[in-house]
Amino acid sequence: MVSDVSGYTGSLSHVTFKLYNTATHGIETFKPLREGQVSIYHCGMTVQSSPHLGHIRKEVVFDVLRRWLECSGYRVTVVANVTDIDDKILAKSAAAGTPWWAHAYHYENELHAAYKALGCRPPTYEPRATGHIPEMIELVKTLIEKGHAYPAPDGSGDVYFDVRSWPRYGELSGIRVDEMSPAEDSDPRGKRDPRDFALWKGHKEDEPETASWVSPWGRGRPGWHLECSAMSGKYLGEAFDIHGGGIDLRFPHHENELAQSAAAGRPFAHYWMHNAWVTMSGEKMSKSLGNTAQVSEVTKTYSPRAVRYFLLAPHYRSMIEFSPSDEGTMGSLDEATKAIERIDSFLDRASNLVGEQVTASHELSEAFVTAMDDDLGTPQAVAALFSQITEGNKSVSIGDAEATRHHLSQVKAMLAVFGLDPQAPEWADVAGSDDRLEPVVDGLVHAMLEQRAEARARKDWATADAIRDTLTNLGLTIEDTPAGAHWSLS
């Protein structure tokens, strides 16, 4: 099968993709439930405030996963939910004096703008929690019927999952029930055990009537953990391939999801995938700690492609330290900016030499494929990318158009997997870009280079140098090769 992501012809009979499974704490060979198809659910954002780099790292990681699986020949279905009803949304909207649904919708739009700004493609399905209340109520009813949930006896309308009724509780996180802290999601007085968590929350007098729905237990709203089990089941079925999110969701959120789904008789996810945090001064980037870097602010200083590179270049299970002072350490946004500049410089130089549109390669290098098949080994894959760029620059310098075309084709295929190809549709709407300008600028520069070549031919060195200086002052690098002069952005 040939994917439209990069053109790489991955044969499913030879795919050896390996993935770290959080549930088993080991690397496993990935085997999808349905041949040729992959189903992925990753937990979306609770739209209470602006998205920061910690949120958007997850979006980038799963976007790269999707691209690589498609590149390998799979048809991929991705579901990412939007939690648009939650305690924090109600509290923050009340403090701001805005309707809770308007508050949620505003920040949902900010989330969409953030992942679009960083070149992430939208999920196949992006369901809102509030649009799936009937499915959630049915799941709660099933759990009550099976003896794994109970309505609170205090008349609050709350319904809890009985953790003691499910012996496998704790299998994902490895935490024993007796070692767990009490669940903090509702009033403990209605619980059989402090660790029981809320499936359904009864309506409270100080909450808007519109933030509640009719249920067999009275008006109320779903608990956070319930939402994902119901929505993943609706769009992917009772069993699907990969469930993911940030590592902080492993417990209690994903543990609770797994327990309530399995207790209801659903096989649920076969692989669990978690990305590490973005940290600041060694601490997890978090709204509660007040140490966040909003995507909209960071992209005012750094190009969106540099920010995306910053988030994908380290391995997804490694922490990324964000330093607002950018002290020049490897992995900083300054280093990411230099990397993007090096990539773009090669693309410009190679395209100028080849003189025609070059498509992505249909066969990626072995080093790149091996790296990506090994649990999305982006650090090694990035190294393979820059190895191609180094060799490609050598070909440009000696004017070898055929070798340059080969390296350019490889680089474009790799950039497509990373979502970093500047000519890809997802970057077409980036602020300040206009594809119509590129041929105009290229034509003007080449006209000046032709005038310079004519001046050099008649030994008019003053004119030739003046043209070169003009182009250099405009931020261009001029390189004389046996095939003629070529330009690139400095």
From Swiss-Prot:
<feature type="region of interest" description="Disordered">
    <location>
        <begin position="177"/>
        <end position="204"/>
    </location>
</feature>
<dbReference type="InterPro" id="IPR056411">
    <property type="entry name" value="CysS_C"/>
</dbReference>
<dbReference type="InterPro" id="IPR032678">
    <property type="entry name" value="tRNA-synt_1_cat_dom"/>
</dbReference>
<keyword id="KW-0479">Metal-binding</keyword>
<dbReference type="GO" id="GO:0008270">
    <property type="term" value="F:zinc ion binding"/>
</dbReference>
<dbReference type="InterPro" id="IPR015273">
    <property type="entry name" value="Cys-tRNA-synt_Ia_DALR"/>
</dbReference>
<dbReference type="InterPro" id="IPR015803">
    <property type="entry name" value="Cys-tRNA-ligase"/>
</dbReference>
<dbReference type="GO" id="GO:0004817">
    <property type="term" value="F:cysteine-tRNA ligase activity"/>
</dbReference>
<feature type="binding site">
    <location>
        <position position="287"/>
    </location>
    <ligand>
        <name>ATP</name>
    </ligand>
</feature>
<dbReference type="InterPro" id="IPR009080">
    <property type="entry name" value="tRNAsynth_Ia_anticodon-bd"/>
</dbReference>
<dbReference type="GO" id="GO:0005829">
    <property type="term" value="C:cytosol"/>
</dbReference>
<dbReference type="GO" id="GO:0006423">
    <property type="term" value="P:cysteinyl-tRNA aminoacylation"/>
</dbReference>
<dbReference type="Pfam" id="PF09190">
    <property type="entry name" value="DALR_2"/>
</dbReference>
<feature type="short sequence motif" description="'KMSKS' region">
    <location>
        <begin position="284"/>
        <end position="288"/>
    </location>
</feature>
<dbReference type="InterPro" id="IPR024909">
    <property type="entry name" value="Cys-tRNA/MSH_ligase"/>
</dbReference>
<dbReference type="InterPro" id="IPR014729">
    <property type="entry name" value="Rossmann-like_a/b/a_fold"/>
</dbReference>
<keyword id="KW-0963">Cytoplasm</keyword>
<comment type="similarity">
    <text>Belongs to the class-I aminoacyl-tRNA synthetase family.</text>
</comment>
<dbReference type="Pfam" id="PF01406">
    <property type="entry name" value="tRNA-synt_1e"/>
</dbReference>
<feature type="binding site">
    <location>
        <position position="257"/>
    </location>
    <ligand>
        <name>Zn(2+)</name>
    </ligand>
</feature>
<feature type="short sequence motif" description="'HIGH' region">
    <location>
        <begin position="45"/>
        <end position="55"/>
    </location>
</feature>
<feature type="binding site">
    <location>
        <position position="253"/>
    </location>
    <ligand>
        <name>Zn(2+)</name>
    </ligand>
</feature>
<protein>
    <recommendedName>
        <fullName>Cysteine--tRNA ligase</fullName>
        <ecNumber>6.1.1.16</ecNumber>
    </recommendedName>
</protein>
<keyword id="KW-0436">Ligase</keyword>
<keyword id="KW-0862">Zinc</keyword>
<keyword id="KW-0648">Protein biosynthesis</keyword>
<keyword id="KW-0030">Aminoacyl-tRNA synthetase</keyword>
<dbReference type="Pfam" id="PF23493">
    <property type="entry name" value="CysS_C"/>
</dbReference>
<feature type="compositionally biased region" description="Basic and acidic residues">
    <location>
        <begin position="186"/>
        <end position="204"/>
    </location>
</feature>
<feature type="binding site">
    <location>
        <position position="43"/>
    </location>
    <ligand>
        <name>Zn(2+)</name>
    </ligand>
</feature>
<keyword id="KW-0547">Nucleotide-binding</keyword>
<dbReference type="GO" id="GO:0005524">
    <property type="term" value="F:ATP binding"/>
</dbReference>
<comment type="subunit">
    <text>Monomer.</text>
</comment>
<feature type="binding site">
    <location>
        <position position="228"/>
    </location>
    <ligand>
        <name>Zn(2+)</name>
    </ligand>
</feature>
<keyword id="KW-0067">ATP-binding</keyword>
